[in-house]
Amino acid sequence: MSAKARGYVALMKLRVVELLLITTVPVMMLAERGVPSLRLIAVTLVAGTLAAGSANTINCYVDRDIDQMMGRTKRRPLVRATVTPTEALTFGIVIGIVSTLLFGFLVNWPSALLADGAIAFYVFVYTLGLKRRTPSNIVIGGAAGCFPVLIGWSAVTGTVGWAAVLLFAVVFFWTPPHFWALAMKFRDDYAAAGVPMLPVVASVQVVTRRMLGYAYAMVAASLAVAPVASTGPVYLVAAVAVGAWFLVESHRVARRARHGEDPRPMRLFHMSITYLTLLFVAIAVTALV
């Protein structure tokens, strides 16, 4: 693969996309109460990857000025000039259009509209509107990362059900503690770039208290899924177990911050990925039993 081709792939941030798509297939299975057709799953995943890649690519285009100031992002293709800004913007728009067409003609148009809404929300509301203006950027803007749940449900049913809305809420409340843990680690990067992430503008005690609050909201939403989606005992036991695990770790981070110790936020960051994966695996299992 040429350097430019690798640059285009890097712009899509496929490692982030993987995390988003972890939620999609289990939700499709829950909506189907079984395994949907492999064709539908494949098209939904490909189109979803292109939609998320489109949003990420355009985000890189907009943020190329601050990416060069941050150690975590200074090796991105636009900073290293592997891909030109015009090429990146064109690529982002084109794969977004391809995503829309795949969803519209091979899945359904409600899913296409949801994918377009996710791209627009991430680019215009988060990247252009909130990211450099308010510490609430990731709280509101993080909603873009919840759309795969709605898209997965819509791909199977053509509508958005209450179970999908509650799972959207789970991911929505999961996002702040997940992302703020990372932002605590790279606080100096965000400060140097002038991005007012909460860990930049608030004390570590304030940040960890808010993370804990969102963790409780996330667990509450995950438990509410059980009666609404009629998931049965397998999901409920899993939601209680992994939810308790997440809350214990969130309390540990808050307690260490309160005592003036290093909260070691990356431990919670990595654990949050495991939490989300296990919760949605439980949803997939529920759909099969």
From Swiss-Prot:
Single GO term (MF): protoheme IX farnesyltransferase activity
Topology relative to the membrane: Multi-pass membrane protein
UniProt-listed Gene3D superfamilies: UbiA prenyltransferase
Associated pathway: Porphyrin-containing compound metabolism; heme O biosynthesis; heme O from protoheme: step 1/1
Gene Ontology cellular component terms for the protein in this record: plasma membrane
UniProt cross-references to InterPro entries, sorted A to Z: Protohaem_IX_farnesylTrfase, UbiA_prenyltransferase, UbiA_sf
NCBIfam families reported in the protein's UniProt record: cyoE_ctaB (TIGR01473), PRK04375.1-2 (NF003349)
Remarks, miscellaneous: Carbon 2 of the heme B porphyrin ring is defined according to the Fischer nomenclature.
Family classification: Belongs to the UbiA prenyltransferase family. Protoheme IX farnesyltransferase subfamily.
Protein name, UniProt field: Protoheme IX farnesyltransferase
The species this protein was found in: Frankia casuarinae (strain DSM 45818 / CECT 9043 / HFP020203 / CcI3)
